[in-house]
Each structure stands twice: as structure tokens, then as C-alpha cells.
Amino acid sequence: MSFHSDLITSLGIKVTRLVTDSRAVTPGDTFIAYPGSKADGRQFIKQAITNGANAVIWEALGFSWNKTWQLPNLAVADLRHNAGEIADHVYGSPSQKMWVIGITGTNGKTSSCHWIAQSFCALGKKTALIGTLGNGFHSTLQPTLNTTPDAIRLHELLADYLTQGAQAVAMEVSSHALEQGRVNGVQFDVALLTNLSRDHLDYHGDMPSYAAAKRRLFDWQQLKYAVLNLDDSFGAEIAEQLQDKGVEVVGYGLNDAALALAERLGLRMVYGSALRMDTHGFSLQIHSSWGGGELHNTLIGRFNVVNLLGVMAVLLVSGVTLSNALHELSLVSAVPGRMQTFGNGDRPTVVVDYAHTPDALEKVLQAVREVVRREIVGIHDGKVICVFGCGGDRDRGKRPMMGAIAAKLADVSIITSDNPRSEAPLDIIAAIVSGITSGRKATNGTYQIIEDRASAIAQAVLSAHATDIVLIAGKGHESYQEVRGVKYPFSDAEVAQRALLAWRDEAQA
């Protein structure tokens, strides 16, 4: 840290605020300029100076300072990855003054992040959260473009939350953020792994590279606790590798193999047994190194149960008592767009979920399949109806995989448009359908193609019986549909609720 602080001191000016967007520079700001994925910040140095920048810190590789820019400046090699430590220094190392939990994994990050923050706040520990649904405090989240902000903005946010009285921060940490150094300079106290499955291969290229990016969080300097899902093979692998590395590994899971691994490695553990689930929620026996108890919640889905075990482990290593953890986790509810349920009772159950990977779609379909209502003989048995598509300009290899999964686990699949972006929706749909029609013997469900997403959702709900579950997967909380560079207003939840009203009107007619 002294290396960067000495360099900043050498500028001869007071650095109080760092900015990476030249358009956002105001008099007295220091401009940080490095190449990004879409533009090179160094091309906007002149604009930053015009807007009142008091100095410029710039990426040294492949660039020369224009001597007509008579302004204090500093060339730094690999600035993008050093920016976090520079920002940490400028903003007074805010993460060192709070309890910081980083959550990574393919699925479950958002729910886990929110449940940790909700539980801490309810217990009197003011907690900020940073993630997909926004940044800030739970009741006043500000929208965000990325799951994890860039390094400069991240440290500014941490400093702001500290000023507002935050004692803790729960933060989603994406693989992109770890790869690009967006969380560099942050002092993490606890790192939580939810799971690892196929995603973002359009960016990382292959699963080993994707896993390596996630793995970085568990090698973090001065990390105190690594909380790992031992039901997940990647979590079990990390647990083995972290032995005698100076960080305490804490496991969690539902499987006997997870418990056996924890016992063999001598780990503290949170383990669940005797799981019972229906459309109204679940009950679970808790066994842990902190004691035992019973957990009830209205959430549905085995994967949500596992996520709650991970959150419980985080709370326990953070000093929360088991009784308080059980109480608070019995009260948490579905995060918007994450197994969010509507209807039920005398209407079909509609579940809106962000599942956009093969593993996530499989897990949510298994979850609703486990709790779909089976009625007495002579009354309609519940079916699972799945509405989904795949995003354009993303990993194309997962499309047929998701089609095959839906065909296997749903009684009816309605293939529709997601966020097609620059691709033709019907081309994406055709790739999904290829997985349904590829001759797999396990394919039992029927399928339809309805390109318009609103029409697909309406058809699914209106055709459902009261005992059916309609799963609308892929977009979750998103309030738009992106087509050819334009984001049109669209909400799966709103469309589903309108369809449920129409279903009720038809049923009463």
C-alpha cells in the first residue's frame, strides 16, 4: 500500500475523488484513464481536463502523455488491476472498518446477499448490499449496471456506506469482477461459495477458466472464513485445497457426503436433514457445530434450502447466535425474480425465476416438480408448464442443453423470446428446440413455440389448471426486454399477474 500512497503523494495535489468517466468529472476530481472493454479512457483525458480534473492517473502501456496537457499526472502499469488499491487508499480503506462478506457462485448470489443483509439489519447490525438488484441499504437500493461495480466506484460506495453508519457489507462478487480486478483492494472477512455450473463461457472460454476466476476469492489476502457448499464438487475441491492455508473453512450442505467430508477435514459445519417441502414452504432439521434446531420457511426449492444453509453459516461465523439465525432465516422471503410466487390456492401457482443457465433451469424445474400438487383420484393432477428462452449474443452452447432439460422435467414447454439482443429470436428458439427434438428417450413433455414473450406467458397461465405450476424462467427481476440495442419495458411478474387476473375472470364466468 505504501507504494501507491507514495505515488499519489508525488502528484503534489490533494486527491479526494477518483472518476473513470470523463463526462462525470467535476472541478477537483482526479481522472483515472485506462483501456476498457468498449473504450479507452485515455482518449478522453482532454475532456476530463476541460471539465476540471486536478490530475490524471493513466495506464502506462501503449500511451504517451501529451505535453500540452499541463496537469499533474501519473503513469501506472496495469492500472486497471491496481485501481482498487489506489481507490482503497484515497477513500481511507473503508472495507477494513466494516465486516465484509463476498458471495460468489453461478446461482444463488443475489438471494444469499439479500438474506444476509436482511438478517444482520434485523439484528441491529446496519448492513449495505452490493449486487444485481442494486447497491445501498435494503429499502433504498440504487439501480446498477453490473453485479459488481468497477473498482473506483466500489471503494467510493464502501466509503459512503461507512459514513452512513454501515457496520457490514454483503457483496455479490461475479467472475467478471474477479477476473477484471474490480474488487481489488477490498478487505473481505468472509467468502461464501454458493455453487459452480456452466455460465459465462462466452467470456471465460471454458469451465476451468471460469472456475479459476471464482477460486480467486478464496485465496484473498487476510480472508478469515471460507464458507463452502460441500454438496457442490467445486466447493469440496476448494475445501481440500484450503487446508493449512490460514483461513478457516466452514462447510454446509444437505448430503451425507458433505457431512462426511467435513468430519474428515475437521471442519465446522451446518448440515440439514429431514427436509419436507410443499407449495407452502419447507421444514428442515438443522445440525451444526453451533448446535441444532428446526428451520421453517415459505420458500420453495431444494436449492433455496441449500442457499439458506450457506447464509446461516455466514451468520454463525459472524457471531450471530444459532437461535437468532434460525429466527431471522425463518422470516426471509423470495428476492424479486428468484422463485417469486404468485397465485396458488384456487388458482395456478406461477413462479418467476432468473434461471438462465442449464443448471439453474434444471434446479428450478426439479423444485417445482417436487411440490406440484397431486389431488385425489378423479381430479386433475398438477402439471409443470415452463416458459423460457435464451439470451442473444451469449453462450450458444447452452441453448440445446436447456431445451433438453425442459423437455425432460416439464410437462409442457413454451419456447419464447428472452433478450434476443442482436440475434433473430427464431434462430435462438430453433437452437433450443434442437435439444428437445434430438431423439432423447427421456423427453416426455410436449412443446410449443410462441415467439412473443407476453403472449407465451398469457397462454401458459390461461391454459393451466388450479393444480398446475407455471414456471417463467430466464429474466427474473428484469424490467426490460432487449431487442436490437433497445430496452423495451417488460416484466415477467407483471405480465404473469395480469394473466392470473384473466384466469380468475374466466373461471368465474
Question: What label would you give each PLM region?
Answer:
Residues 54, 189, 411:
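Receiver (REC) domain switch/active-site residues of two-component response regulators
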Residues 1-85, 89, 233, 271-275, ...:
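N-terminal leader/targeting and accessory segments in enzymes
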Residues 62-67, 179, 190-350, 435, ...:
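Acidic, Mg2+-coordinating active-site environments of NTP-dependent enzymes
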Residues 36-39, 335-337, 367-439, 453, ...:
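Active-site beta-alpha connecting loops in nucleotide-dependent enzymes
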Residues 24, 36-38, 175-176, 198-199, ...:
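Short glycine-rich anion-binding loops that position phosphate/pyrophosphate groups of nucleotides
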Residues 469-502:
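Glycine/aspartate-rich loop-and-adjacent alpha/beta segment that forms the canonical ThDP
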Residues 65, 81-230, 234-247, 309-312, ...:
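Phosphate-binding loop of NTP-binding sites
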Residues 47-52, 57, 221-224, 245-249, ...:
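P-loop/Walker A phosphate-binding loop and immediately adjacent motor/lid segment at beta-alpha junctions
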